[in-house]
Amino acid sequence: GKNILAENLAYIFNRPAYNVSFHVNTNSGDLIGTDTFVDNEVKLRKGTIYQCAEYGGFGILDEINMAKNDAVSVLHATLDYRRSIDVPGYDKIDLHPAARFIGTMNYGYAGTKELNEALVSRFLVIDMPAQTEESLEFIFRRMFPNIKENARTQFIGVFLDLQLKATNSEISTKPLDLRGLLAAMKIVE
């Protein structure tokens, strides 16, 4: 849901989308770029953040709370008033005026951590609300118009019960996966 929203924003603003999926091995070179050989010469292979900055796209920083400090340090100057990237061994580049960055994250997943205040302050935080019975009803009616009322009510009830237990830390957030539930229902349909 979060990444689809980010990609749709890029589409609405008619800007290219550059996706970065953070994981424990993502480093600053992956974001800015690394040296490579082209025709027996060392050239910069531009990273995702570099390309986004250069062409004015939407940088979608997926699971930003899994990023190592090395990777996050690249984002500080990029996201603050300087709006620039220092490319070691090359030049400093200024961000295209249309360049935007959207960080997405899930709380409580393995390998995630709290974001530091300096990074969070560079974003406008949008907390995606939990699903309500009404929103689930809308989704299920659109995706499964032929499902029996009783079955739809039960599926919604199971999801809401799991969501409540996850919110109260009675269970992990892992079982709470609307995408997975919808995929399972498509198989049964």
Identify the role of each PLM range.
Residues 165-189:
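C-terminal helical "lid" subdomain and adjoining coupling/linker elements of P-loop NTPases
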Residues 1-168:
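AAA+ P-loop NTPase catalytic core and its hallmark functional loops
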